Amino acid sequence: MTNNYQKPNPDDRSDNVEKLQDMVQNTIENIEEAKESMEFATDEEKQRIQEKNARRNESIESFRSEIQDESAARENGYQS
C-alpha cells in the first residue's frame, strides 16, 4: 500500500525579507493610488479610503517589524 500523505514543505525562510519588502512597496503603491482616486470620490468614499489607508499603514508597520525579525533570524542562521 502506498502512502498518500503529502510530506510537509520545508521551512524555507531565505527570501522572507525580500517578500516582505515587496509587500511594503505594494502597499505603499496602493495607498498612493487610493489617494489619487479620492479626487473623484464622494465624501462617503473618501472616508472609506482614509480608513482603509489607515489599516494599510498599520500593515506596513507590521511588515517592517517582521522584516527586522527576519533579518535578525537570517543573521543568526534561522535558529529557533
Curated annotation (Swiss-Prot):
List the GO biological process terms.
asexual sporulation; sporulation resulting in formation of a cellular spore
What upregulates it? Expressed only in the forespore compartment of sporulating cells.
Which keywords fit this entry according to its UniProt record?
Sporulation
Where in the cell?
Spore core
Principal subcellular localization: other
* Annotated segments matching region Disordered: 34-80
- A Pfam family it matches: Tlp
Source species, domain of life: Bacteria
Q: Where is the signal peptide?
A: none
Q: Where is the composition biased (Basic and acidic residues)?
A: 34-73
Q: Which family does the entry's similarity section mention?
A: Belongs to the Tlp family.
Looking up NCBIfam families in the UniProt record yields: SASP_tlp (TIGR03090)
Q: Which HAMAP family match?
A: Tlp
Q: What is this protein called?
A: Small, acid-soluble spore protein Tlp
